[in-house]
Amino acid sequence: MKLRLFPLLLLVLAFSSCGSKKEKDDTTTDTTICESSDYNSSKDLIDLYHQADSLVKIGEIDTEMMQLFVDNATAYAEIHPDDTLTPHFLLYAGIFEMDIALSTPSESKRNARFFQAVDIFNDLTKKYPNYKNLPYCYYYKGQIYENMKRTSDAEGEYRELVHRFPDTDLGRNIADYLKVRGFEKSSDDIMHEISQK
């Protein structure tokens, strides 16, 4: 019985290894993108981002692929600080790090990842102060701090966003959000309102 299965197994392996050259090249490319940790090309990094982001958009979060992007985007930023795509890569690295944190069950590990995302956003705001999407760094830091239940830190980030970018749609929306959330009131004002009820 075993002797009859062995040739059949060999035949199946032979057919499965056969394929067009294009199929083999596509497989090699995908493997290279997923396994490589050396992204010298912005195109490779963009491709990796699109792969990870397309999964996020359909609700399939691949934290390993996202982490690969984060690691390579931050490394790329160190090697190519003057590349016009570098701030974009850092913004998306921060967002992915935040998404990874949100899917991390352990609170201490989740908070560590949140702080890594904040560090990426801080690095971006420091090195690229004229980046057009800079307001989103403050917004995402505020979101992170709210998720961590650090409301005073969240309020600080939101206020910085409103102060620095008051004429943007995001700045106006966050100003309204601050009013709705009650951030406009001091803790004494809130306590006074509670005691009046």
Language-model-detected regions and their locations in the chain:
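Short coil/turn connectors between adjacent alpha-helices in alpha-solenoid helical repeat scaffolds
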Residues: 54-65, 99-114, 149-150
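Alpha-helical linker/edge segments of TPR/alpha-solenoid repeat scaffolds
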Residues: 96-105, 143, 147-153, 180-197
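Bacterial signal peptide processing site
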Residues: 19-22
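C-terminal motif of bacterial Sec signal peptides marking the signal peptidase cleavage site
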Residues: 15-17
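Structural signature of alpha-solenoid helical repeat junctions
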Residues: 43-44, 65, 85, 92, ...
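Short solvent-exposed coil/turn linkers within tandem alpha-helical repeat scaffolds
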Residues: 76-86, 124-134, 162-175, 184
